[in-house]
Amino acid sequence: MTNHFIGIGKYIPTEKISNLFFEEHQFFNEQGEILDQNNATISYKLKQITGIEERRYARKDQVTSDLGYMAAASAITNANIDAETIDYIIFAHNFGDVKHDTIQSDMVPSLAARVKNLLKIQNPYCVAYDVIFGCPGWVEGVIQANAFIKAGLAKRCLVIGAETLSRVVDEHDRDTMIYADGAGAAILEASTNNKGIQAHLSASYANEEKDYLFFGKSYNSEKCPNTKYIKMYGRKIYEFALSKVPLAMKKCVDDSSYNIDDISKIVIHQANEKMDEAIVKRFYSLYDQDVPKNIMPMNIHKLGNSSVATIPILLKMIMDNDLENHQINEGDVVLFASVGAGMNINTFIYQF
């Protein structure tokens, strides 16, 4: 038995934030020293490396669960189902609801419970819980939903990925420019024609890799040292991803009934354009092949890195023909992959 998506939804915040937004920021390095480069140079290098020209921020009156609700409602409409028939709501995020101009995370009750409330679902046996798994959280939620359905514990699951990273960034850290807000969702149920999830794989590296992404103090030493922000060791993450993610993708393909030539698209977490390109190039090199043309759709240029939301948003955009030269047709085999805090990696193969 395989399980497939019957509805996909997204919510892209309306606030467009270009790189010009950061021109007046004062950036420091990890030692608390003001960066020598001017902000125009920093912005130029950011675009060259990550591909990011602009990103989206949630409105001041919105929090992560609001974004997740909008994406969930979109997926339910797309599936044309009664929300009361959903057995599980799995909400992937990392920082809970953080109100504008605060840094305190609110995770009780769970964001999944908040979405269930907003959807007005009365069924008490619709179970709502959160997944904290770094950027791969939405993919992991899909893998868990797949397991629930296969085990006979559910017939229909709603998996949400949403984040408001703009609320947890250090304005004095140039990495702030990478992060964005957004939400995506999908509804999974059993397939009658063996289409859907064909194979999957997850891994956690939690030794020296554990703190490659972490919560740390501002680079501005004059700020309150007890206030924490999202921080990362970019070079270490890049090297880790390039080393581990292609191998995981290959193992997933090799453990399935497909081969590398069957893959129509690779939908990968929108973390960094150069890193994603390097991962896919390394993946194909493991098969002694060049990267096929138009294999990897991207939306990071305009939407930035919204963590768990990047993959479902990207998938919805492809399905809606919103990306030039990227379509998914019936029968296509798509490889999904993500990497993030933990450090966690996951991947699954899906036939449409």
Predicted region positions:
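Flexible, glycine-rich active-site loops centered on histidine and acidic residues
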Residues: K150-A183
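Conserved beta-ketoacyl condensing-enzyme motif
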Residues: F5, D61-I132, Y258-E277
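A contiguous, well-structured pocket-lining segment that forms one wall/lid of small-molecule binding clefts
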Residues: N226-I300
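Conserved catalytic cysteine-centered active-site region
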Residues: N39-V63, V98-R156, R282-I313
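Condensing-enzyme catalytic core mediating Claisen C-C bond formation in acyl metabolism
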Residues: M1-D61, D173-S243, L247, V339, ...
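Acidic, glycine-rich active-site loops and adjacent beta-strand->loop/helix elements
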Residues: A92-V98, I132-G137, G161-S166, A203-S204, ...
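Short, well-ordered amphipathic alpha-helical segments that serve as non-catalytic structural scaffolds
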Residues: T41-I42, S65-A79, L111-A112, F240-S256, ...
